[in-house]
Amino acid sequence: MTTNYKYVASYDVRRALLNELQDKNLIDLNDYYADGFNTPLEPILPAQQVPEFNNLLPGKTYIIYDVVQRNTGVAWWMSEETITFDITSRDQAEIQTFINLITDLFRRYDQAATDVNLVLSPNSPYTYYWFRIESADPVQAFMDEGGFMSGLISISYSYSREVNGQTGRYL
């Protein structure tokens, strides 16, 4: 069996958030088809993809994410990360709604982890143990390029990955 180093824990966190946004009718992926594309663009994207996203779907709301791995000390079998979501929209109320939903989804420590574990991809090697809100910055008073505003929320979470019982290396 070959270890998949491409699949990272933040994929599951982003998937859980996108599912929740769709379930609450806050994002409709049918609105995210660019001309000539057969599949919608995912509105949760790394900062490097923002120029292309804005060129293909100008004016659409999107979420920029960034992930930082945190030190867990000698508990090497556990991992912790902080993911930051920067909601970018032209609608202040929409930004606040997204922040409120993200807060509600991820503020419940082990209960939030249970929810994320229930929507994992069958290929996910991860198990999540807790989530917590680190900080939430409401809608910024200034406007970014193109009339966009933004709001920021940071979430920390703990997880483990399937490992070889003898070597401790990822499976």
Regions found by a protein language model. Give the residues of each.
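Interface-prone segments of viral and bacterial extracellular assemblies
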Residues: 1, 19-20, 74-78, 158-160
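Small/polar-rich, solvent-exposed N-terminal microdomains that initiate assembly or binding
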Residues: 1-71, 112-116, 170
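Hydrophobic beta-strand residues in large extracellular and virion-surface proteins
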Residues: 13, 17, 21, 63-65, ...
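Polar/charged alpha-helical tracts
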Residues: 19, 30-31, 93-100, 104, ...
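Short acidic, S/G/P-rich loop/turn micro-motifs used as interaction or catalytic elements
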Residues: 71-72, 92
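Short, solvent-exposed beta-strand/turn "edge" segments of beta-rich domains on protein surfaces
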Residues: 72-78, 143-148
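Oligomerization/assembly interface segments of phage tail-like spikes and tubes
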Residues: 77-95, 100, 149-161
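Acidic-leaning, charged glycine-interspersed low-complexity segments
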Residues: 106-168
